[in-house]
Amino acid sequence: MCGILAVLGVADVSLAKRSRIIELSRRLRHRGPDWSGIHCYQDCYLAHQRLAIVDPTSGDQPLYNEDKSVVVTVNGEIYNHEELKANLKSHKFQTASDCEVIAHLYEEYGEEFVDMLDGMFAFVLLDTRDKSFIAARDAIGICPLYMGWGLDGSVWFSSEMKALSDDCERFISFPPGHLYSSKTGGLRRWYNPPWFSESIPSTPYNPLLLRQSFEKAIIKRLMTDVPFGVLLSGGLDSSLVASVVSRHLAEAKVAAQWGNKLHTFCIGLKGSPDLRAAKEVADYLGTVHHELHFTVQEGIDALEEVIYHVETYDVTTIRASTPMFLMSRKIKSLGVKMVLSGEGSDEIFGGYLYFHKAPNKKEFHEETCRKIKALHLYDCLRANKSTSAWGVEARVPFLDKNFINVAMDIDPEWKMIKRDLGRIEKWVLRNAFDDEEKPYLPKHILYRQKEQFSDGVGYSWIDGLKDHANEHVSDSMMMNASFVYPENTPVTKEAYYYRTIFEKFFPKNAARLTVPGGPSVACSTAKAVEWDAAWSKNLDPSGRAALGVHDAAYEDTLQKSPASANPVLDNGFGPALGESMVKTVASATAV
């Protein structure tokens, strides 16, 4: 991942303004520690902090067309850049960077080229011939992008909020799958897949097609000129990613440079069952496995840094981001700059445990659509910013455009969880990779129950967070929470504690509004809370809040351990809510 900052149409064109923009761009240097660049044209500035993954020697940014009349600063990876270049034979490329193709596509097709890009990206392009500019973000929002407005009428774009929040009074999270054009002065959606309308598909389930499309998504993401690995938790999604990479690594170009032994990484509290599960998968696949550990106190000590980097006060995101943040630092110290991760599968296939209560296929499908549309506010944000904090790039094959189209075109009747038919959550994915002749994974891993990421770190992690928050947030503070924080009022002490840290770094109202809110159970949307009347009384992001679904649900454990406090203030769940919470070690894949 790189860091981009673009400021267009400023009133002040002094050297002091240029210095200020360079200073703000440095706030993104963690995203791109390999090189810095800036292009200034009259009242427009495009700055870049580079993480060199493809073409490390000549791909420094900003990038240009032949006569430098078109300038672009990009954060992303364009997996089909060679195919696109082949259709641009009249153009002369200056670098081997996958991102340079954007400048030349603009010359050929104007603003209508974005849907041709297969990859993850956020970019700003300036046409100096008429001083027009465009900005765009990838289909799902894998790469972060913010847009702001200065008091002088300038328009700002940044990979992270921290580079524009001080100088813009108003700013937003740039919507995924959209393009901004200065010519029209507005945003428009360039990504219009069939599933976006939420109409119910009727295509029969084709396991071979699903498997093949996922393998293609993996293979294209092996495009790298630097060492890479896979985040492996021992859960289904990360294990499938590791398995498919293992099968195809030897034939990939990267193997010639870095060898055909796959490196896998996991992190967790010592003694966690998922450390053993991840090692079992790694041994089965023959990977070079790196098992990393952290303590509850180390996680708590990192909270301020995590919230600063991830730029949210959402409880689930912070719980899950912290181990991923710690792991990314270790990964970078080992010389690895890119990892593949398993985000997105639960949204596409209804893998969260609350989907067991979906009343029919219509509501099941509509909820998956809502979840995918919100990914940029949750798992994409976590995966990108937790890794980018240490200059590591995370690639997410489940969010491949073509794979999503294939998966979301399946009649949702096949995705419904039906225990009487032997269909557990994500059965269509599990079944697609259930190969008796050449197994991808051991059966018990392939059919393992979903464990939510922050749950999987263990109750000793989550309870440690709650205990720490209880020491810093009093009952009287909670009584006044709605007055102190009228926007997205925190309803637990843990949420209140995170909010105080967030406000220290990002005190403006515009920053608060970039974070989602509303009721949720086990990571559901507010709409899905209506599926079970009991859920409205038990709104917690933990997967075990899906009462009557999880093997170690809260209701089962509460019979063994009394609630410790006011349920309004701390969710009412005591510290002994089941040692089985020490599962799904923080591989940062939420699987």
Curated annotation (Swiss-Prot):
GO biological process: asparagine biosynthetic process; L-asparagine biosynthetic process
Listed GO CC annotations: cytosol
Superkingdom: Eukaryota
Keywords noted in UniProt: Amino-acid biosynthesis, Asparagine biosynthesis, ATP-binding, Glutamine amidotransferase, Ligase, Nucleotide-binding
Domain Glutamine amidotransferase type-2: 2-185
Tissue: Expressed in companion cells of leaf sheath vascular bundles, and phloem-parenchyma cells, nucellar projections and nucellar epidermis of dorsal vascular bundles of grains.
Domain Asparagine synthetase: 193-516
InterPro entries: Asn_synth_AEB, Asn_synthase, Asn_Synthetase, AsnB_N, GATase_2_dom, Ntn_hydrolases_N, Rossmann-like_a/b/a_fold
Reaction catalysed by this enzyme: L-aspartate + L-glutamine + ATP + H2O = L-asparagine + L-glutamate + AMP + diphosphate + H(+)
Enzyme class per UniProt: ligase
Site (Important for beta-aspartyl-AMP intermediate formation): 343
Name recorded for this polypeptide: Asparagine synthetase [glutamine-hydrolyzing] 2
Source organism of this protein record: Oryza sativa subsp. japonica
